[in-house]
Structure formats: C-alpha cells, structure tokens
Amino acid sequence: MVLVITFTLARTLLFLGSSVYTFILWFSLIVRKNLVESFPDKDLKEIKAIERKFYHFFCDYVVEVIKMFSISQKEMKRRMVFTNLDEVRAELEKNDKKFCFLYLGHYCNWEYIASLTAWIPGMHGGQIYHRIYNQAFDELFLRLRGQFGGESILMKDTLRRILTLRKQDKRVMIGFISDQLPKWENMNHWTRFLNHDTSFFIGCERIAKQVDAALYYVDVERVKRGYYRATFRLMTLHPKEYPD
C-alpha cells in the first residue's frame, strides 16, 4: 500500500512538474514573440531587459492578489489610493450625471481597482467581468472582487443590468477593462496599436450614449512595490456629442 501511494504521488508530482514547465515555456515564448513584434526597433538586449521587468511585475501581481484574500479595508485603502474622487463626484453632481463609466486596462494591479467601492459611500460601484472557464476560479475571483462591496456584472448582462440600475435613485460608477480581444462578431473598430492591427471593444461607448454616462479614464501608476495611485482623467461628460 505504501509503495502504491508513493508511486501515485511521484507520478502526480511528475505530471504537475511537466505541466508547469510546459506552461512556463509557452508563456515565455508568447512574451518574447509579442515584444519582438511590438518593438521591431529594439535589439535583443533591450527586449530581454523589458522581459525581466515584466516578469518581476507579474510575480508581484500574483503575490498581491493572493494577499487580497486576507487584506483589511484599511490596509487596502493604504495600498490603492484614488486621488481626485471628490472632484469627480462634484462634477457628476453638477452635471446631474447618474452614471459614470471608467475605462482602464490590465495594467499595474487591476484587481485593486475593485476596492474603489470602499471610497465612494452612497454610490453603487461595480465592474464588468468575463466569466472564467474554471468554475472554482470564477467563484474565487468573484469573492475577491466583491469583498469591498462592488458588484461584478457579467459581460453578456451589462446592458440589462445598467438599464435596471437606471431605475434606482442612486449614482453608479462602473469599470470597464477594455483591452482584451473582442469576439469576432464584435470586431467593429480597428486601429494600429503596438505594430499590430487591433480590434477594440466599443460596447462601453454605445451604452454610455444610451444612459448619458460621464466617461473617465483611470490613470493608474505604481508608486512603489505593492502601492498604487489612480487618477481620473475626464474623457467627456456628453458622449452623445461624438459620432460612433
């Protein structure tokens, strides 16, 4: 029996080790390929320097996300600071804006942005999310993103949920991470980005026009390891004035 258990454990560890090695190899090849294609003017030495910075950054992100499962709201507010929220709220009230949509990307620690709800008492905060294929991970990240009171809105339910929120008497602030690849049927806007022909999501713009939402870009910067600062940059208070 001991031999059987030992053999099974050894085989499992070998399988896991092989899988991890394969993933790391695949990941490193993708990173190198993307950097070389995006920055054709840089030599291999410069590319490798960017790679090293990226891997350090990514590892910090993983550790920070794990820490989020046990972090207090007080500590979270020390590590993720939103600098000009009072100005934003005053602008929304002055222009009688019920909705504020936030554009941001997968930069710095985007999971920290979900703590925004802790900074906006009296407002309904949330973020649009795409369901993770693995159910256990999906439930884990839903709990992570909702621990400070924010609502995670499934991407396919975005418009329906926002129209429901419009009937409620409160101001709403919702984050859209819009730097992923849209599905083929949603590839309506193309541009040249990082030396690639790139399609962008336009759903946020369309919904903003329907509910007359203010649009802000969330400019996130890393202050030091584990600490971030976000500044809201006004894009427009009147999205209907712009052509599709």
Task: Provide a role label for each language-model segment.
Residues 1-104, 109, 138-143, 149-150:
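Membrane-anchoring hydrophobic helices of lipid-metabolizing enzymes
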Residues 69-244:
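Soluble catalytic domains of membrane acyltransferases
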